[in-house]
């Protein structure tokens, strides 16, 4: 049997960012509108600093207005909420993203609830979650949106396909299931209490792994020819024992990739699969929010 097609999320995301950049230039020339994204970072978490740096660079490369607010680790919740209120009222800012995790003195739920739903480019606000659940226009969480784009690029029409989403988080699992339902797939959401999870997975034409457990989904769980989207990003010890003993790590997904690629029809690698799509879809949401703020229809050719 031939090996699975490797779904190149990095290349797809680069193409999407290029098309977003062209749409931004059109907004600038036709409407004098420049989409603006504000990212808020509290503290000095190294991973968060890298994420914020990458987001800022890609926002500027797309021709958007980019603002980063770096706050000290001892920032109070009241101070952060005050900043969010200012960003909500700023007409040059169309998207607001607060980088998680936050320090323990700050309640992330209260912070996310304070963001104007029309500027909630992460798509985490309960208003946007509700809009997605009932099929109304809103801002969709970036990672599930990116997964849907990759799926439609590989499969085309998802109508009638059996999709299994392993994981039920508010960030990936639940919104992913809603997007698949809207695409007319038949959807099962599996989780830690699912009985005979391997058998459930084997029934999937489309398998989305979003559990945060390294290589939990084995090759024997996958139906021959299935499309596998691996959302997991997990750090595990390096393969080389000496490197592992020195604290070196490697990144793996939630799927045992080497096993799965001999069975699946197509699969996303980790890294280089879903990850690059997340920031690209953040830019897409910022563009969408900017268009809606002025009553402009977002470009249809950018949406899945």
UniProtKB/Swiss-Prot annotation:
Record GO terms (molecular function): methenyltetrahydrofolate cyclohydrolase activity; methylenetetrahydrofolate dehydrogenase (NADP+) activity
Pathway(s) it belongs to: One-carbon metabolism; tetrahydrofolate interconversion
Known partners and oligomeric status: Homodimer.
Annotated Gene Ontology cellular component terms: cytosol
Protein residues bound to NADP(+): 167-169, 192, 233
Matches recorded under InterPro entries: Aminoacid_DH-like_N_sf, NAD(P)-bd_dom_sf, THF_DH/CycHdrlase, THF_DH/CycHdrlase_cat_dom, THF_DH/CycHdrlase_CS, THF_DH/CycHdrlase_NAD-bd_dom
Function: Catalyzes the oxidation of 5,10-methylenetetrahydrofolate to 5,10-methenyltetrahydrofolate and then the hydrolysis of 5,10-methenyltetrahydrofolate to 10-formyltetrahydrofolate.
GO BP term, example: purine nucleotide biosynthetic process
Catalyzed reaction equations: (6R)-5,10-methylene-5,6,7,8-tetrahydrofolate + NADP(+) = (6R)-5,10-methenyltetrahydrofolate + NADPH; (6R)-5,10-methenyltetrahydrofolate + H2O = (6R)-10-formyltetrahydrofolate + H(+)
Keyword terms: Amino-acid biosynthesis, Histidine biosynthesis, Hydrolase, Methionine biosynthesis, Multifunctional enzyme, NADP, One-carbon metabolism, Oxidoreductase, Purine biosynthesis
PROSITE patterns, A to Z: THF_DHG_CYH_1, THF_DHG_CYH_2
Listed CDD domains: NAD_bind_m-THF_DH_Cyclohyd (cd01080)
The keyword Cell inner membrane is assigned to this record: no
Keyword Nucleus: no
Protein name listed in UniProt: Bifunctional protein FolD
Transmembrane domains' residue ranges: none
Homology family: Belongs to the tetrahydrofolate dehydrogenase/cyclohydrolase family.
Enzyme Commission number: 1.5.1.5, 3.5.4.9
């Amino acid at each position: 049997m031939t090996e699975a097609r490797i779904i190149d999320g990095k290349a797809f995301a680069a193409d999407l960012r290029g098309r977003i950049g062209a749409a931004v230039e059109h907004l600038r020339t036709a409407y004098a509108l420049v989409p603006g994204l504000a990212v808020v970072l509290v503290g000095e978490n190294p991973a968060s600093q890298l994420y914020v740096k990458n987001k800022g660079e890609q926002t500027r490369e797309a021709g958007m207005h980019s603002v980063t607010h770096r706050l000290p680790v001892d920032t109070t919740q009241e101070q952060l909420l005050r900043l969010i209120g200012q960003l909500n009222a700023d007409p040059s800012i169309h998207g607001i993203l607060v980088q998680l995790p936050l320090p323990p003195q700050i309640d992330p739920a209260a912070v996310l609830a304070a963001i104007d739903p029309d500027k909630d480019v992460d798509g985490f606000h309960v208003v946007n979650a509700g809009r997605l659940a009932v099929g109304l226009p809103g801002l969709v969480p970036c990672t599930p949106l990116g997964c849907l784009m990759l799926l439609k690029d590989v499969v085309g029409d998802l109508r009638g396909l059996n999709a299994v989403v392993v994981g039920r988080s508010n960030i990936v699992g639940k919104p992913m299931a809603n997007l698949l339902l809207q695409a007319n797939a038949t959807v099962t959401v599996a989780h830690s209490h699912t009985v005979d999870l391997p058998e459930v997975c084997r029934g999937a034409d489309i398998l989305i792994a979003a559990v945060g457990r390294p290589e939990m989904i084995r090759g024997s769980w996958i139906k021959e020819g299935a499309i596998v989207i691996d959302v997991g990003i997990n750090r595990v010890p390096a393969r080389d024992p000496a490197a592992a003993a020195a604290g070196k790590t490697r990144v793996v997904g939630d799927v045992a990739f080497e096993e799965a690629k001999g069975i699946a029809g197509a699969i996303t690698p980790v890294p280089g699969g879903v990850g690059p799509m997340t920031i690209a879809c953040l830019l897409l949401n910022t563009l969408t929010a900017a268009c809606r703020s002025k009553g402009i229809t977002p470009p249809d050719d950018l949406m899945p």
